Amino acid sequence: MCCPNYNSARALAQFLTERGLRMHKKWGQNFLLDPVLRTQLVKILAPERGERVWEIGAGIGAMTALLVQNSDFLTVFEIDRGFVQTLRKLFDAHVRVIEGDVLQQWHAAAAQEQPACVLGNLPYNIAARFIGNTIESGYIFKRMVVTVQKEIGLRMTALPAQKWYSYFSVLCQWQYEVRVIRNVAPVCFWPRPHVVSQALVLTKRNAVPSCVDPALFLHVTKTLFSARRKTVRNNLLTWQKRMPGGAAVCVEELCARAGIDARARAEQLSIYDFITLSDTLRALL
């Protein structure tokens, strides 16, 4: 089997029709037609010799065809069974294909392979969950190059006091340097999505902001963002009722020791503020 013309919507549609395949909206399937952008993304990923690369949502191989030329070891994840069979016919000698939901498969695969780099056009319904799950699990890739809906990209890069700043912003920027590569217009995809996308590169930080208890840091950060319009004080009081040993902590004293204004909201705090707050809390528990 030969690869189709990945630059042509008509050629891709014909390729699918001839093999009884079709696109599934529920999986957010959109193929990137722009050959210049495809090449740019692989160049930015820049895997080194001997490194394992993951591709998330390989489709019928537009990015895979480039990755096999630029990586020694490649694993692709694909949920669509028809596409899985196609990938195996096109690239079987060079690629490990894992069938299924990457959210369910990645942890076991990472334990086996220790991947360094990840590339993927991530659908809206899994983008934040996949990136968030890997970070929360302590698995940090050397580099990730992802294409996501622009809304997700804005959340990943947002800074304190900006509209899209959230727990997810803190989570991503805690472990990665996050940079926007470019916005990607709907016309660059087939089928055309109804939203603008964004390509980003996440590079593992050389010096990660350290905290005494990473799990507590994440828990405190998530708690403070759980009700965005509430103050730090009120969110901590809510947390206090649920946390074992929380009753022994004076919220006002905690904020004072951490140098945090108890009247502030989570969206006003920096990563270092959350770390200071969680470290101070750990000392008081």
Swiss-Prot record:
GO terms for cellular component: cytosol
SMART domains membership: rADc (SM00650)
Annotated positions binding S-adenosyl-L-methionine: 30, 32, 57, 78, 101, 121
Subcellular location: Cytoplasm
GO MF term list: 16S rRNA (adenine(1518)-N(6)/adenine(1519)-N(6))-dimethyltransferase activity; RNA binding
Catalytic reaction equation(s): adenosine(1518)/adenosine(1519) in 16S rRNA + 4 S-adenosyl-L-methionine = N(6)-dimethyladenosine(1518)/N(6)-dimethyladenosine(1519) in 16S rRNA + 4 S-adenosyl-L-homocysteine + 4 H(+)
SUPFAM superfamilies in alphabetical order: S-adenosyl-L-methionine-dependent methyltransferases
Keyword entries, A-Z: Cytoplasm, Methyltransferase, RNA-binding, rRNA processing, S-adenosyl-L-methionine, Transferase
Top-level EC class as recorded in UniProt: transferase
A Pfam family matched in the record: RrnaAD
NCBIfam families, A to Z: ksgA (TIGR00755)
Functional description taken from the UniProt entry: Specifically dimethylates two adjacent adenosines (A1518 and A1519) in the loop of a conserved hairpin near the 3'-end of 16S rRNA in the 30S particle. May play a critical role in biogenesis of 30S subunits.
Protein's recorded name: Ribosomal RNA small subunit methyltransferase A
Upper taxonomic lineage: Bacteria, Pseudomonadati, Spirochaetota, Spirochaetia, Spirochaetales
